[in-house]
Amino acid sequence: MSIPGGEPLIHKEMPQIVEGIIARKKFVYLCTNALLLEQKLDQYTPSPYLTFSIHLDGNRERHDKAVDREGTFDKAVSAIKAARARGFRVTANCTLYAGEDPEDVANFFDYAMTLGIEGVMMSPGYSYQHAPKQDVFLGRRKSKELFREIFKVGKKRKSKWHFNQSSLFIDFLAGNQSYQCTPWANPTYNVFGWQKPCYLLVDEGYASSFKELMETTDWDKYGVGRNPKCDNCMAHCGYEGTAVEHTIASPLTALNVFLFGPRLDGEMAPELPVLHGGQAPGVAIPVSQIGRITRD
């Protein structure tokens, strides 16, 4: 179970919520920007079922620019060190945007490994409808090219990066798999109910129960090539589930990528066919117009 942030630690009952999840022997990832983590650590007890997933979008300058708040990187790093010193499990959650420099990203991954975290969960920024500053997000082709360049830097350096993701999802990011989204693999529940079909699309309605979500959602309406809202998405919430299914079906393929890394040269896997006839309102600007991050 993942509790998303922002900063969910502001919820006054969050320690009790986490305790209840752990009591059921469910793994919980508490996703936080870490602004309050150090002062709240005393409210939590280290457990193999609890992981703090800290939002870090790069090294100091890059992260502070991405979140538009100076000092957040240093605060997050301090919180990571404090949590690790107390025996908590910690990972980093990194979103990559347009204009990333592969060397800078590789430098961040190298640094993150020195913090004693279990791994980095990474995902390309996706232009979902209600996200601000739509021009900073990545299209699918640009995402794959970026990840190949990042992995090439790591391979050249012989870096030992640990990712909190399956090897075939990494292979997908590098452009070597033609995956369709599996949105039901990571369902979203909030105060409005069970969100259809995933946490990134917020205008598709809600279900009152998980059973209703699974049985009444028209899953075939969503995914790359099926819905223009989904066309540039490569987010882990939809594709990690697909990668896990592929891993179960083809364990040797997954093992090969785990041992030797993703292929970084040559043709990429073909994109899925486009079956929809147009562009939905609110979908992000075309990939050709995506530029570097700018801040007012």
Where do the PLM segments sit?
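Radical SAM enzyme [4Fe-4S]-AdoMet core and its adjacent flexible, acidic
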Residues: 24-27, 47-192, 196, 201, ...
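Hydrophobic side chains within well-formed alpha-helices
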Residues: 14-17, 72, 210, 229
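A generic secondary-structure micro-motif detector
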Residues: 4-7, 30-31, 69, 98, ...
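Conserved SAM/AdoMet-binding glycine-rich loop
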Residues: 1-56
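Hydrophobic pocket-lining residues within nucleotide cofactor-binding pockets
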Residues: 8, 37, 96, 125, ...
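Flexible mid-to-C-terminal extensions adjoining Fe-S/redox cofactors in radical SAM and related proteins
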Residues: 195-296
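Short secondary-structure boundary/capping segments
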Residues: 44, 178-179, 221-225
